[in-house]
Amino acid sequence: LIKQPWQGSCEHRSEPARHSTLAGIALFAKERAMTENALIEAARVSKAWPFREAQKLLKRYPQGKPGGAPVLFETGYGPSGLPHIGTFQEVLRTTLVRRAYEALTGGAPTRLVAFSDDMDGLRKVPDNIPNAELLSANLGKPLSRIPDPFGTHESFAHHNNAMLREFLDRFGFEYEFVSASDRYNSGGFDAALTRVLECNQAILDVMLPTLREERRKTYSPVLPVSPTSGVVLQVPVEVLDPATGMIRFTDEDGTVIEQTAFGGMSKLQWKVDWAMRWYALGVDYEMCGKDLTDSVTQSGKIVQVLGGRRPEGLIYELFLDENGEKISKSKGNGLTIEQWLTYGTEESLGFYLFREPKSAKQLHVGVIPKAVDEYWQFHGNLAGQALDKQLGNPVWHLLRANGGDAGAGDTVPVTFSLLLNLIGVLGADATAEQVWSYLGNYVADASPEAHPALADMVRAALATNRDFIAPTLQRRAPTPSEAKALKDLDNQLATLAADPTAEELQNIVYEIGKNEAYGFETLRDWFKALYETLLGSPQGPRMGSFIALYGVPETRKLIAEALES
């Protein structure tokens, strides 16, 4: 990894067939260059947020990073818990900026480091962890020096780091994993620690004014590891010799200890640690949540004290629950990534996380259906869009996130919302086989093999219906005027030729709703009546599409049941 030069003071540092083939190759190269140039020009003025972020890096290095070095992107992970949707969000969004920068620069080299803060001392026992007493007995120790309560890895941190890597690999992210413990223990951070010790007082001058009076008495940029208990200590530290790393502090039992801060015998306070990492690794870009706004400010000052440069970055808003309250692990009011992937699709998750990172988002099951449908709507629009519009299309960015190219604008033949309405009629015990038999009314070659994306939507829709929709559906009896309109609809469906189109069916429904004899003040009232009497829901799909999918005979049975009620 990139390291900075060190200094001893705390000052700032800143044939015909052959000819034909060659001509063809030259023409292809020219066309490719023209396409690439057009992309670069469009990217330079794009207002899509990944390009806005990438443009910051272009200003940082107008001629590219010195020496042709790759621009370094970083994401952080605290391994006191398992990877979660926030972890995915940060790696995905950082990757989107990375790919935008590559497009903006015509392929400038980049790297993404996934950094694990596994030297942190364990402050409390996480929920839902086996062998909690094992963790309780090791509170305060670095996460990488605590036994694994799952019994599968060298330490608790090793277990969670493995989960992180498996998690990131599952989604195809391109990254390099770096462990804080490995860096501290191997001496990989010793040079950076030397610099911190040299600048100890200057760092205190940054941090002390931000602390309460009581905290100032014990605050030290360096946190020694007790030689007796192995706990990361929060005690005052006297720097004796930055070159050798020698420090003096009082241990938990009152013994005055002199030991080196190097080789894993200490770690740094959070804000100092973040700044040191930026400095040591040469980080150019890192984003974080709104809750770390002050950390960005103070760590930015500290990295400048060390002689480094604060990275570019984005401060994003945090998730809210369906009531607009902050999501809390202790409350359990959030949505896990496993839950999203049960009731939605991977593409829809990426799409939802792409949109407006600086705006607070509600995160609950109710937002998933719209995200699924909007993803495919944007996907279908992509091929027909001009280049500047493509760069503003979330799907363009998502398809390129892991090295792919923007797709050909394909889409799915049925919306997720329509699937939910179909399955809602079939009931809580609906099966995939049933759904595919109905899809045969609407989709050519209706099979999971021919339509894998649709198959994933069917899976998610079945789970959503089973757990959330079916228990709430309740059809009501139609009013007398609604019953007359339903009877008219049934009569017209009975006279239709085989295989009517969704549009033909929609026109029939539409004309009945406009018939003043049935007394609907607006078409919305008629559609609402259809949803409530036939589907058991206050809202629903375009009825023409639903009838085409469900089938005319089956729809007539629904009408008959409603009229009988």
Regions found by a protein language model. Give the residues of each.
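A structural motif corresponding to the C-terminal end of an alpha-helix
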Residues: 104-108, 163-176
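Charged, often glycine-rich, active-site loop that binds/positions anionic groups
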Residues: 119-136, 192-193, 197, 326, ...
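A glycine-rich helix N-cap at a beta->alpha junction
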Residues: 133-154, 167, 171
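Basic, alpha-helical terminal appendages of large translation-related enzymes
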Residues: 4, 12, 19, 28-68, ...
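Catalytic adenosine-cofactor/nucleotide-binding cores of aminoacyl-tRNA synthetases and other
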Residues: 291-296, 317-463, 535-565
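N-terminal catalytic cores of NTP/NDP-binding nucleotidyl/phosphoryl-transfer enzymes
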Residues: 35-127, 273-295
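Active-site cores that bind ATP or allylic diphosphates and position pyrophosphate for catalysis
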Residues: 173-331, 337
